[in-house]
Swiss-Prot record:
Name the record gives this protein: tRNA 5-methylaminomethyl-2-thiouridine biosynthesis bifunctional protein MnmC
Listed cofactors: FAD
Keywords: Cytoplasm, FAD, Flavoprotein, Methyltransferase, Multifunctional enzyme, Oxidoreductase, S-adenosyl-L-methionine, Transferase, tRNA processing
General function of this protein: Catalyzes the last two steps in the biosynthesis of 5-methylaminomethyl-2-thiouridine (mnm(5)s(2)U) at the wobble position (U34) in tRNA. Catalyzes the FAD-dependent demodification of cmnm(5)s(2)U34 to nm(5)s(2)U34, followed by the transfer of a methyl group from S-adenosyl-L-methionine to nm(5)s(2)U34, to form mnm(5)s(2)U34.
Species of provenance: Shewanella loihica (strain ATCC BAA-1088 / PV-4)
Family designation: In the N-terminal section; belongs to the methyltransferase superfamily. tRNA (mnm(5)s(2)U34)-methyltransferase family.
Subcellular location: Cytoplasm
Region annotation tRNA (mnm(5)s(2)U34)-methyltransferase: where it falls in the sequence: 1-258
């Protein structure tokens, strides 16, 4: 790796006792090139940083690395994955977001994460995903425990850099669980002159021994020294202690797997992956796999992507908040921030995506919904950038039309063209990766034969076969349950008609998305969109005059202003699609459950008269049956723009055996088998 000195002005403002060297900061490469596990020839480096909350050195290091990446000269063949663990108010994270050396869009994205104050894993993908940064916000030990060990050893963390102030034994063992067997540890010495030297040295020596006990080769890092002296080898573990440490690491991993056996996170197999789809979710999955250099065959029943539920002219993108802010609300917040990032990345890559992050204004439409919104906004200390309460006057000023009620304003939200977003993601995937696309290809059956997947299809009026494929992902919206392997999935289709409203005064003054009993967008191409209807298991997708009137009524009953008279549906212009919805409103993402095997085991428990407690324990500790190599991505409901891209990224990480950018509760929330397993692990009837 190159060893290029870099002057970092941002460190000059540090307190003298905390600054490692205010005149010169060693480069990222100068520090990590000392580690053999992170050799310069390694094309994929995975490094984690765990600084103390008040440290400022990480901002300088990361800004320098991002600047290199932005030059498009340094990381052309090398992929770097950084994991950053930070408290919400960590000064170094704030310094990174405000760094003058950090270019947009990275600066903007990191600032959005800081401002949002949303705990959990935030993924940033830069320079066509050659540089990935996962920011894990919250208590570091909690965040580490919540991360699932990568199923592929080569995808585990190769090196750690942590302050002595930020490290203890519990943290070290969780770091070890997430690491490669030969991973190394850089322990940053504390140079604060105000500390007692004897006590400081004793603490450093103790931490060094704990790090070695956990199986790491430990190095000490002193940023005040020259590049050729800043890293010194503290000690390597003996062969005997290393063997004990590896046993402990495996036990920790097994303990976690056993705890969540009902939620299998099996990785994909080596080889080509087939994706059946055509909407936002499948397109983003194709892009996520292309960024990893994976070979993909993409199957779409239509002549182009984005012709089904993702074909609307405009769709609202905003979070789904709840008063208790549980896993569902938390996931939608993370997904919301990731979707915004994805859209901006595609725009920066030259793709045209009509959109406007003009904000979303949500108001109630009856007494119950008014009370619900009041409860939501008052229940949590939402960040100003996420959601804030507004009165009727403020709402009117934001909307540009008269709003007679108080509500919630989402400043970062807005609208985007789902079809354009879908097509841009597919186009970028084809540009980056090894993707073959098949259009006007209706998959009629799938089968697993000789450990491979095969597809039967109708294309150009002819029966054709495709395969073999190592992995198969069903992301085909309303056709998700068309196959024998998935026809029991607890998911339903809801028809939705979106009405197109001509732009005219005073409606054309609308400048933010309105959401109450339905939504209404600002005009694009001289049309507003409003809707949508919600009809379960509809028999057809024809235009409905009844639903057109219902959409109009929703607007006029939600808002009493004179401007609603300009909402004109007489042109009978609308678009109809079907969105797939789960009972808990969360998407389905992960291994395809084998319902026949689940049902057979359940019946066996009944026949052998297992007690409720015995049956529950069995389901809790036994890996739930799945179809090998088959995965589900669907059930995005009405907010697929918010939830779909992140679900696709998590699934791509699972397929590739990586450390997943999601906590265990969110992974359990998304699992396609959750409706059944929630009952079975409690000993209830299937």
């Amino acid at each position: 790796m190159p060893n290029i000195p870099l002057r970092v002005n941002s460190l000059a403002t540090e307190h003298p006792n905390n600054a490692q060297n205010s005149d010169k900061m060693p480069t990222f490469d100068a520090i990590f090139s000392h580690l053999s596990a992170i050799a310069s020839h390694n094309s994929h480096q995975i490094i984690a940083l765990l600084p103390s909350s008040d440290a400022n050195w990480p901002a300088a290091l990361i800004a320098e690395r991002l600047t290199q990446a932005g030059s498009k000269q340094h990381l052309q063949k090398q992929h770097l994955h950084l994991h950053l663990f930070a408290q919400h108010q960590a000064s170094w994270l704030k310094a990174l977001a405000e760094s003058e050396t950090l270019a947009s869009p990275a600066k903007e994205q990191i600032k959005a994460i800081c401002d949002a104050r949303v705990s959990g894993s935030h993924r940033l993908k830069l320079v066509n995903a050659r540089l990935i940064i996962d920011i894990h916000l919250g208590d570091p030990l909690t965040q580490l425990k919540d991360l699932v060990s990568p199923s592929l050893a080569s995808q585990a963390i190769q090196g750690w850099l942590a302050n002595t102030q930020a490290t203890d034994e519990a943290l070290i063992w969780q770091m070890a669980r997430l690491s490669q067997d030969n991973a190394e540890f850089l322990l940053l010495e504390n140079n604060d002159v105000n500390l007692d030297k004897t006590s400081n040295n004793a603490n450093t020596n103790l931490l060094t021994q704990l790090i070695i006990k956990a199986g790491f080769t430990c190095y000490r890092l002193n940023l005040s020294l020259k590049d050729d002296q800043l890293v010194t080898l503290a000690e390597k573990p003996s062969l005997a202690s290393l063997e004990i440490a590896m046993v402990e690491r495996r036990a920790l991993r097994r303990q976690q797997l056993d705890k969540f056996a009902f939620n299998p996170l099996t990785q994909g197999r080596e080889g080509e992956t087939a994706i059946i789809g055509g909407g936002v979710a499948s397109a983003n999955l194709a892009l996520s796999l292309a960024e990893r250099g994976k070979k993909v065959s993409f199957f779409c029943m239509d002549k182009a992507p984005g012709e089904q539920a993702s074909g609307n002219k405009q769709g609202a993108i905003y979070p789904l908040l709840t008063p208790e802010h549980g896993s569902l609300s938390h996931y939608f917040l993370l997904g919301y921030l990731f979707s915004r990032q994805r859209i901006k990345q595609l725009l920066e890559s030259g793709h045209e995506i009509p959109h406007d992050f003009c904000g979303v204004l949500q108001t109630g439409h009856d007494e119950r919904s008014h009370k619900r919104l009041t409860k939501i906004i008052n229940a949590q200390p939402w960040a100003e950038s996420i959601a804030r309460p507004v009165d009727a006057l403020q709402a009117t000023a934001l909307a540009g039309v008269t709003i007679e009620h108080q509500g919630i304003y989402y400043p970062l939200a807005g609208w985007v063209s789902p079809q354009a977003f879908t097509r841009a993601a597919i186009s970028q995937a084809e540009r980056l990766g090894k993707q073959t696309s098949h259009y006007q290809c209706q998959i009629t059956a799938i089968r697993f034969e000789n450990q491979q997947w095969y597809l039967s299809a109708i294309q150009d009026g002819q029966k054709v076969e495709f395969g073999p494929y190592a992995n198969l992902v069903l992301a085909n919206g309303r056709h998700l349950t068309d196959f024998a392997q998935t026809d029991h999935l607890p998911i339903s289709g809801f028809r939705g008609q979106v009405s197109h409203i001509p732009e005219r005064a005073p409606l054309k003054d609308l400048k933010t998305v309105l959401c109450a009993h339905g939504y209404l967008t600002p005009a694009h191409d001289k049309l507003h969109c409003t809707g949508a209807s919600y009809v379960k298991d509809a028999s057809n997708l024809d235009y409905s005059a009844v639903e057109q009137v219902e959409n109009l009524d929703k607007i006029r009953t939600s808002y009493g202003g004179e401007w609603t008279k300009a909402v004109d549906i007489t042109g009978h212009s609308a678009r109809v699609g079907v969105r797939m919805v789960t009972r808990d409103h969360a998407p389905m993402m992960g291994c395809a459950p084998d319902f026949e095997a689940i049902s057979a085991t359940y019946i066996s428990h009944q026949q052998t008269k297992k007690s409720t407690k015995e049956s529950a324990k069995c389901w809790q500790t036994t890996s739930a049956p799945v179809h090998q190599g088959l995965f589900i991505l669907g059930g995005l409901g009405s907010r697929g723009l918010t939830s779909g891209p992140l679900a696709a990224e998590i699934l791509a990480a699972q397929l590739c055996g990586e450390l997943l950018p999601a906590t265990q509760d969110i992974l359990a929330l998304l699992n396609p088998n959750r409706m059944w397993m929630r009952k079975l692990i409690k000993g209830k009837a299937l």
